[in-house]
């Protein structure tokens, strides 16, 4: 019985330790929601996701992930967008540098803007 309790306690501690640590003070989360000009077009969606992934090479980005909207019946959830991008920067300065980086501007002008009818950005600072 002691062994079972000991194992249960160990597993509980391990599961708590697997949570991501809180973001550091001064970091910025950059959230981009994109509505496609041709909603549901798989080739366009793939091009948008690939363009987002290419941005990983830009310095100052601590985290980048992109995906599609999760359908929801909850009235509070806005699932009307097609592609979402979440990024974390180590500072406001890094975000500002990213915004003017030629690689970012190229993807915005050659892929994101031409294939998007709407783009909404949220920046969250800690």
Give each language-model segment a name:
Residues 13-82, 90-96, 123-126:
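Short S/T/G/P-rich N-terminal loop/turn motif that feeds into the first structured element of a domain
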Residues 96-100, 108-116:
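Short, exposed beta-strand-loop hairpins at the edges of beta-sheets
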Residues 30, 101-104:
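Histidine-centered active-site/metal-ligand motif
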Residues 53-56, 103-108:
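A common structural junction motif
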Residues 4-15:
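Bacterial N-terminal signal peptides
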């Amino acid at each position: 019985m002691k062994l079972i309790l000991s194992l249960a306690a160990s597993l509980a501690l391990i599961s708590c330790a697997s949570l991501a640590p809180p973001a550091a003070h001064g970091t910025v989360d950059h959230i981009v929601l994109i509505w496609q000009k041709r909603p549901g077009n798989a080739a366009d969606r793939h091009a948008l996701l690939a363009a987002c992934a290419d941005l990983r090479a830009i310095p100052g980005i601590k985290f980048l992930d992109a995906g599609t909207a999760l359908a929801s019946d909850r009235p509070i959830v806005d699932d009307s967008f097609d592609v979402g991008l979440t990024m974390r920067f180590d500072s406001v300065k890094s975000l500002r540098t990213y915004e003017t980086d030629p690689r970012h501007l190229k993807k915005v002008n050659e892929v994101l803007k031409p294939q998007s009818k709407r783009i909404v950005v949220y920046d969250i600072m800690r």
